[in-house]
């Protein structure tokens, strides 16, 4: 029985990570659309801002997944 639960757990984790990846892309596209309408795309400031926003988004998602994994192991 433990083998089946671990397989289902890993499949659900992969599905959750796929959803999180799509959320990252959706938020990134929305923020970049806002930045492109406000800032010219060929400036150095736009490139730096785009990189910083992407880094912050990935950092926040990484922290969220870390705390979710930490809380999941504490419950067991």
Swiss-Prot record:
GO cellular component: host cell cytoplasm; membrane; viral envelope; virion membrane
Domain of life: Viruses
Topology of the protein relative to the lipid bilayer: Single-pass membrane protein
Cell compartment(s), UniProt: Virion membrane; Host cytoplasm
Virion surface topological domain residue ranges: 67-76
UniProt induction comment: Expressed in the late phase of the viral replicative cycle.
Transmembrane segments: 46-66
KW Signal (keyword) present: yes
Segments on the Intravirion side according to the record's topology features: 23-45
Leader sequence residues: 1-21
UniProt keyword annotations, A-Z: Glycoprotein, Host cytoplasm, Late protein, Membrane, Signal, Transmembrane, Transmembrane helix, Viral envelope protein, Virion
Annotated InterPro entries: Poxvirus_A9
Keyword set includes Transmembrane helix: yes
Glycosylation (residues): 71
A Pfam family hit: Pox_A9
Stated role: Envelope protein. Required for an early step in virion morphogenesis.
Family under the similarity heading: Belongs to the chordopoxvirinae A9 family.
Protein's recorded name: Protein A9 homolog
The organism's taxonomic lineage, starting at the top: Viruses, Varidnaviria, Bamfordvirae, Nucleocytoviricota, Pokkesviricetes
